[in-house]
């Protein structure tokens, strides 16, 4: 099976089932003891069958360690959305109060991308505006902010597919267990 690459440069990387054959979700995160200081969640979309090519069309991330990193606890959640024929957009997603347990936030990001895959594909293809994105599961009420930025494109990946049967696709529940173990909590917390 041809698949997009896992995020590079992270302590832990996983591929999570997306429920679609034309999409993959990948997750990368770092560990410092039982703390996760940075993570990346990507939604990959198959943009070409011949040659097979995957693009990362939606990106959610957190990095509290880098000077130019995005700290979701200070700046809020956002999604960078690639567009096929225009520059990428940065959409701020309102949330009420994010849990301090990063694993819960990462799982929330994977759920958000999985449940709203068609929205991200439609924005990528130009069939829908990025304005008024789906709400974050906690129902945050602040208005969404849409910022068109060209620098977002440089962080999104366009890659050829690759073969690696050793990289299994895990379920959302398996991801939850991995994240809980990384933070030294139980999956129910």
Task: Please provide the spans of the model-predicted regions.
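Negatively charged, low-complexity tracts enriched in Asp/Glu with abundant Ser/Thr
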Residues: 1-55
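Acidic, aromatic-enriched beta-alpha/helix-loop junctions
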Residues: 38-82
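Short Lys/Arg-rich cationic patches that frequently serve as NLS/NoLS or arginine-rich RNA/DNA-binding motifs
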Residues: 1-2, 151, 159
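Mixed-charge, Lys/Arg-enriched low-complexity segments
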Residues: 63-151
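DE-rich, low-complexity intrinsically disordered acidic tracts
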Residues: 155-189
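Intrinsically disordered, low-complexity, compositionally biased regions/tails
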Residues: 13, 21-23, 73, 80, ...
């Amino acid at each position: 099976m041809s698949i997009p690459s896992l995020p590079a440069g992270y302590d832990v990387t996983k591929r999570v089932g997306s429920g679609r054959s034309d999409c993959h979700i990948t997750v990368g995160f770092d560990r410092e003891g039982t703390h996760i200081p940075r993570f990346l969640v990507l939604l990959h979309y198959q943009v070409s069958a011949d040659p097979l090519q995957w693009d990362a069309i939606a990106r959610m991330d957190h990095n509290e360690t880098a000077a130019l990193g995005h700290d979701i606890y200070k700046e809020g959640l956002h999604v960078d959305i690639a567009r096929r024929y225009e520059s990428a957009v940065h959409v701020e997603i309102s949330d009420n109060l994010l849990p301090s347990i990063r694993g819960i936030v990462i799982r929330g990001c994977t759920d958000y991308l999985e449940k709203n895959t068609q929205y991200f594909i439609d924005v990528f293809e130009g069939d829908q505006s990025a304005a008024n994105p789906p709400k974050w599961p906690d129902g945050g009420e602040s208005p969404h902010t849409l910022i068109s930025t060209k620098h977002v494109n440089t962080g999104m990946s366009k890659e050829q597919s690759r073969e690696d049967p050793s990289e299994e696709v895990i379920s959302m529940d398996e991801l939850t267990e991995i994240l809980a173990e990384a933070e030294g909590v139980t999956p129910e917390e």
